[in-house]
Amino acid sequence: MLGPRLPARQHWDLVDNDPRLLKAASDARPSNDISLNTIQFDLNGAFEMMLDRPADIVTTSALLDLVSESWLDRFTRHAAARELSVYAALTYDGRIDLSPADPMDAAMTTAVNAHQRTDKGFGLALGPSGAVAAISMFEALGYLVLQGTSDWEIGTADQGIQIELLQGWANAAREMKSLPDREIDYWLMRRNAAVDRRASTMRVGHVDFVATPSTIR
């Protein structure tokens, strides 16, 4: 999405703590005009040094719902001090819409969202509030923020990812212990049966935003 809007020749520093993700990203390089440098780094540490590298824009993907409020405050303030533009993609916002509907869907979504707010390695996570919190912080720092939804829309043919998501949600709900395990198991059986019949669709809510400092408008 972002790449075609930038100059043909680009350099990206890719930062993650998972070497497998870094290799996958490097292998997927779309053009010889794009150079990549992979950096294995635990973002729970002194990540500010990553923001101090020469950069025109900083991007994140599926991150801001996992971090704590204090981590996000450090990130936004340091980005503002460097006058960096930030593009944040795929921040989960708490919306899960499943079809066909099941009587347990709302309770399961509540349990999943509670789990999203547990510690993911950065302190208590913001979970579904991550995008809203980040946008508010950037705006308070004088940034112009443009936002929009970027929901996952998962169709009947996408059985593999549906099964993986359902199992992950069931596991999360069990960890929260707010619902009887038997009810979670029955919900999972009903939902998987709909997937097997190719009758199941999903919409999982996400938000994208770009935050631009006033100095480069």
Predicted regions and their residues:
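Regulatory N- and C-terminal appendages and interdomain linkers associated
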Residues: A24, R29, G123, A199-T201, ...
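A short, conserved alpha-helix within the catalytic core of class I
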Residues: A46-E48, L64-L84, A88-T91
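Conserved catalytic/acceptor-binding region of the Class I
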Residues: L84-T149
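Conserved Class I S-adenosyl-L-methionine
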Residues: I135, E139-R217
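Class I SAM-dependent methyltransferase SAM/SAH-binding core
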Residues: M1-E48
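A conserved beta-strand element that flanks and buttresses the S-adenosyl-L-methionine
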Residues: V58-T59
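Short, hinge-like loop/turn segments at secondary-structure boundaries
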Residues: P30-N32, M104-A107, E164-L165
